[in-house]
Amino acid sequence: MQNIPKNMFEPAAANAGDAEKISKKSLSLWKDAMLRFRSNKLAMVGLIIIVLIILMAIFAPMFSRYDYSTTNLLNADKPPSKDHWFGTDDLGRDIFVRTWVGARISIFIGVAAAVLDLLIGVIWGSISGFRGGRTDEIMMRIADILWAVPSLLMVILLMVVLPKGLFTIIIAMTITGWINMARIVRGQVLQLKNQEYVLASQTLGAKTSRLLFKHIVPNAMGSILVTMTLTVPTAIFTEAFLSYLGLGVPAPLASWGTMASDGLPALTYYPWRLFFPAGFICITMFGFNVVGDGLRDALDPKLRK
């Protein structure tokens, strides 16, 4: 082995400024959250599932020669085949087309209910948390009273009183659905309203609306987004349960809930009538739940590196 003389080496001079240098480029909260979300394989699987279901709901009925409401008693209760991929129901309607038309309605109900919960909950929770004092007490006691009533019971009562329809279901779900969002937003506002940048803006004369929707709510958007994502599968499941009770969307409209309700009595002899709508309810709920969990982990400041 060849010996290398020591005089060929020169010790590296320590630079005091090197300790102050940032070795890694700093990332914003959202960029860092996006990177960690993309590294979460289960969350990405859930996102792909949701995107595929939405695309199929939009385009699949367009390329089928069957209509979701056309009946043909000669083809009633046919098993899955090359002509009817998911089989037919008791009226001879193609279950494949009805499944994807039902996906439009079920997902629309879930997203619409989540958006209304977001709007009402953010406004209610923001005002309650920011005002504090007697205003906070009154607003949260009202929310507690509504929360004390079983939400499903209130939804069923409203569905009985109001005329059956798509928007009636959404309104009934929103009556108590916003309370959880309001509580979360209120907690975030109570933490953020005493931060230095909020106090500085308040000192400079910023209005309450600007303080809330310019400084406070955007910084609470992580928790809001996660809660909204987890609200969608709950609304889809609630619609399915209401359909089982006969309070779903009226015929000839199809949702996963109404299809599952119609297919349940025929489970023994025609299982495909229940299997496909119930299966997609489970898959969609799984997708939204794992995406919500992934967002929660990605936006958790304790996990930031």
Swiss-Prot record:
The lineage of its organism: Bacteria, Bacillati, Bacillota, Bacilli, Bacillales. Residues 103-292 form the ABC transmembrane type-1 domain. It comes from Bacillus subtilis (strain 168). Its main location: membrane. GO terms for molecular function: transmembrane transporter activity. InterPro entries: BP-dependent_transpt_permease (IPR050366), MetI-like (IPR000515), MetI-like_sf (IPR035906), OppC_N (IPR025966). Keywords: Cell membrane, Competence, Membrane, Peptide transport, Protein transport, Sporulation, Transmembrane, Transmembrane helix, Transport. Part of the ABC transporter complex OppABCDF involved in the uptake of oligopeptides. Probably responsible for the translocation of the substrate across the membrane. Required for sporulation and genetic competence. Induction: Positively regulated by TnrA under nitrogen-limited conditions. The complex is composed of two ATP-binding proteins (OppD and OppF), two transmembrane proteins (OppB and OppC) and a solute-binding protein (OppA). PROSITE patterns: ABC_TM1. GO terms for biological process: establishment of competence for transformation; peptide transport; protein transport; sporulation resulting in formation of a cellular spore. The chain crosses the membrane at residues 43-63, 105-125, 166-185, 212-232, 236-256, 274-294. It is found in: Cell membrane. This is Oligopeptide transport system permease protein OppC.
